[in-house]
Amino acid sequence: MQGRLSAWLAKHKLAHRPLGFDYQGTETLQIKAEDWVSIAVALYVYGFNYLRSQCAYDVAPGGSLASVYHLTKINDNADQPEEVCIKVFVPREDPRIPSVLRIWKGANFQERESYDMLGIFYESHPCLKRILMPESWIGWPLRKDYIAPDFYEIQDSH
């Protein structure tokens, strides 16, 4: 079933794939990485002015990685703001997604966390570096094929 936003994107010839609705009725769309920035700008113009959250996950061992964006349309008189969930899937061999930091400033630390934990490279992010793990950490801890080191010494900063 095609939702209202999917119909709007189709009307404007913006490439996407409807994935259905969640239990709260939030429409979920799949967007290709190469189309993400142009669609993100269109969504912002459409009124999705708030990035509620961004996260990422490993779909399956050896499979693709996904970056998930929850966007909300906030205005002065909205009791129940419209929301949409966007999923961008990328291959684990070269996981690159354009950053949307210039559109939604709230993407800054969230994209950095996804980079730190899963190794998704957010192109044109001005400060894409580890945020939770030490800079010397090797690998991406939340990938399903990650092998944890037997021992890792964290240096005391005092």
Curated annotation (Swiss-Prot):
Record's GO cellular component terms: chloroplast thylakoid membrane
Pfam families, alphabetized: Complex1_30kDa (PF00329)
GO molecular function: NADH dehydrogenase (ubiquinone) activity; quinone binding
Xref: InterPro entries: NADH_DH_suC, NADH_quin_OxRdtase_su_C/D-like, NADH_UbQ_OxRdtase_30kDa_su, NADH_UbQ_OxRdtase_CS
Family statement drawn from the similarity comment of this UniProt entry: Belongs to the complex I 30 kDa subunit family.
Protein purpose: NDH shuttles electrons from NAD(P)H:plastoquinone, via FMN and iron-sulfur (Fe-S) centers, to quinones in the photosynthetic chain and possibly in a chloroplast respiratory chain. The immediate electron acceptor for the enzyme in this species is believed to be plastoquinone. Couples the redox reaction to proton translocation, and thus conserves the redox energy in a proton gradient.
UniProt-recorded name of the protein: NAD(P)H-quinone oxidoreductase subunit J, chloroplastic
Species of origin: Cryptomeria japonica (Japanese cedar)
